[in-house]
């Protein structure tokens, strides 16, 4: 049975690819947690926590597209399952990576993820990181290689140009392998930006 969002009456089914619905429904029923869809957060796409009541809650940002939302949801379910099976272990350690790979297997299908994302996703899952944003190619593919309205990816900004990020001005500098050196105009320190950061 599909679980509506608490107090909102909306269903999560509109947030994921249609062919993924039965698999997600099974995971929600099997692992007994509340799924809460929340407003965009700057620092994370989702999280898993045990509430003071002892119940488990997973939150996922409402601004993600269906493919990002599904991946984030399964990422957080993997934290929950890892907690159930192994107790307190490293948040993105080997136990979590193994559980995450296992939970993602049913979703690695061309009727759920487009082919251009599937190969990148399979590669990412071989050694998943805390955030899909750390894998630049996967992150860009999940976003459809399109930045949010009114923003640009840092790699699209011209060398030497000044841009704003979190209300601070930076000047784009040289590229180091996968990241760009950017000078904070206020404190004159150099920071490294992943090339998929939106500014």
Residue ranges and their predicted role:
Residues 70-71, 93:
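Conserved strand-to-helix beginnings and helix N-cap segments that scaffold or border functional pockets
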Residues 3-51, 57-58, 63, 87-199:
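Metalloprotease/metallohydrolase-associated module, dominated by Zn2+-dependent proteases
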Residues 71-84:
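Active-site recognition of the HExxH zinc-binding catalytic motif
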Residues 65-69:
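Conserved short loop/helix modules at catalytic or binding sites
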């Amino acid at each position: 049975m599909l679980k509506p969002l608490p107090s909102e009456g909306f269903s999560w089914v509109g947030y994921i690819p249609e062919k993924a619905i039965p698999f997600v429904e099974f995971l929600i029923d099997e692992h007994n947690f509340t799924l809460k869809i929340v407003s965009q957060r700057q620092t994370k796409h989702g999280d898993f926590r045990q509430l003071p009541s002892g119940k488990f809650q997973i939150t996922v940002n409402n601004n993600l597209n269906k493919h990002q939302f599904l991946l984030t949801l399964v990422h957080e379910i993997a934290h929950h399952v890892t907690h159930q099976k192994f107790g307190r272990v490293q948040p993105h350690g080997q136990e979590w990576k193994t559980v995450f790979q296992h939970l993602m297997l049913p979703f690695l299908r061309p009727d759920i993820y487009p082919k251009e994302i599937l190969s990148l996703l399979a590669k990412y899952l071989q050694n998943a990181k805390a955030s899909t944003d750390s894998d630049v190619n996967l992150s860009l593919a999940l976003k459809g290689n399109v930045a949010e309205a009114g923003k640009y990816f840092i790699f699209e900004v011209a060398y030497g140009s000044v841009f704003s990020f979190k209300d601070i001005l930076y000047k784009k500098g040289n590229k180091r392998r996968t990241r760009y050196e950017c000078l904070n105009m206020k404190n004159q320190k150099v920071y490294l930006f992943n090339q998929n950061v939106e500014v």
